[in-house]
UniProtKB/Swiss-Prot annotation:
Pfam families: tRNA-synt_2, tRNA_anti-codon. It comes from Cricetulus griseus (Chinese hamster). The modification Phosphothreonine is found at residue 591. Substrate binds at residues 277, 301, 339, 341, 497, 501. Homodimer. Part of the multisynthetase complex (MSC), a multisubunit complex that groups tRNA ligases for Arg (RARS), Asp (DARS), Gln (QARS), Ile (IARS), Leu (LARS), Lys (KARS), Met (MARS) the bifunctional ligase for Glu and Pro (EPRS) and the auxiliary subunits AIMP1/p43, AIMP2/p38 and EEF1E1/p18. Interacts with AIMP2 (via N-terminus) and MITF. Interacts with TARSL2. This is Lysine--tRNA ligase. The modification N-acetylalanine is found at residue 2. It is likely that the same gene provides both this cytoplasmic isoform and an additional mitochondrial isoform. The lineage of its organism: Eukaryota, Metazoa, Chordata, Craniata, Vertebrata. It is a peripheral membrane protein. GO terms for molecular function: ATP binding; ATP:ADP adenylyltransferase activity; lysine-tRNA ligase activity; tRNA binding.
Amino acid sequence: MATLQECKVKVDGEPKLSKNELKRRLKAEKKLAEKEAKQKELIEKQLSQAAAAAATNHTADNGVGVEEETLDPNQYYKIRSQAIHQLKVSGEDPYPHKFHVDISLTQFIQEYSQLQPGDHLTDITLKVAGRIHAKRASGGKLIFYDLRGEGVKLQVMANSRNYKSEEEFVRINNKLRRGDIIGVQGNPGKTKKGELSIIPYEITLLSPCLHMLPHLHFGLKDKETRYRQRYLDLILNDFVRQKFIVRAKIITYIRSFLDELGFLEIETPMMNIIPGGAVAKPFITYHNELDMNLYMRIAPELYHKMLVVGGIDRVYEIGRQFRNEGIDLTHNPEFTTCEFYMAYADYHDLMEITEKMLSGMVKSITGSYKITYHPDGPEGEAYEIDFTPPFRRISMVEELEKALGVKLPETSLFETEETRKILDDICVAKAVECPPPRTTARLLDKLVGEFLEVTCINPTFICDHPQIMSPLAKWHRSKEGLTERFELFVMKKEICNAYTELNDPMRQRQLFEEQAKAKAAGDDEAMFIDENFCTALEYGLPPTAGWGMGIDRVTMFLTDSNNIKEVLLFPAMKPEDKKETAAATETLESTTAGPSV
């Protein structure tokens, strides 16, 4: 803000400000100076109290720290850091090595919730631990804490009469603030109003929180902060914890389901000389010792099929894939999939397995085959998704012809330039965007997305893809130009992809060569030729079916999340603004470099 003196002169030929504007600015300057002086006075007072607390173990506000809550976060951090430093100087360790917990907060609540109001079990002493979310004083000798952990809350009713000594009672309660992690040794009981509590004999500070914790009443709603500081999100928002519990249940269910079918869980490389197994753009890394580029895996498929060649008939893997593509509501550069390969099976068998797995999973986790989903967020329209088997099945080309109202060329001609031109013209006529290169496979994919996928609310198998879209799938046994492949769509999004595997090494090499031509034409997502895999096929791959499912998208449906970042603990985020980062660093340095008291 310009000072009054600055306002009295012309700058770069600009006219002087009016008298009223000068008065307004002078008044604003005075108000700002008063505010800064008041804040400085408050900081000095708090620093003085912090030093006094460490020396005398007593403060005027019973240790609740109400005035501290009025400070800005940086001031609060500075005061708290110096108070903790003072504890260390006085010989006390605010970060003890160990605190033995007898019973979890959840177990405590389950075991003692039947107590009657006013009960106090003095013959039972237990140890619990958790994070303080609220602190309330009722006079000088009774302080209440809300202790949270494991998604539950337990009240701590600290009374000087029950504490090991009044001096210790004052000392510990002066130290504690919202956000601190504490250990509590005490007796189960209930207040006269019926609030289940632990009545402490001793409280131990286990790890102080140096930052001002947002109040649960207001919560943490800013999505940028929630995703960048997931630890804070988990501290304040229990619904986030519940989402990741559901995610863990999904993975556990899949693993158990496949184990019972006799599948062997395996691990395959995440860095490869050649990226393969899917049509996608890979990440490139560099290996110093080998002096060569390596690719982060986009899919584990080729390794799995080589293991089936080796005689392991049923294999599966749950792990991360990496694709150097866009970030949006349903895509993250690294994501989790489950893939399995089953010898002596075809895509019809996998449709049945998919129905059993998904319907059973939804019923097991939610208690019903039907779920409610909000694709546009909690405030948007709600859809009911029914996972009751069997799922709807449609043939891709036949259904696309119906939706477009046109007769497409015979599928045996889909690899011709004439078909590509027809599809190109249809996309133009229907205003369907397709960035170059406008290959037949890409044009088909855009048309299917625009006209078929949008009809798939309940689980729907889109089957029998053209061969030009499926370089690793086996040709259809009765429909020339098509493959025995399906994709499962739910709420317009693909969650599964599977097919009868191509096991003819000559045909596989030919398709790889066609993919190489597409890559040379500018298609970054086309596949490389993998000679090692082709050689493995020459030893004989039995009739096999392969399947892949995105864990993240399934989790989105079962947790009613419309953004993939909600179901990833640490999603990919754009870097923060450099100026903001520098300012934050400068602030941190200034608060940590201050003198100790």
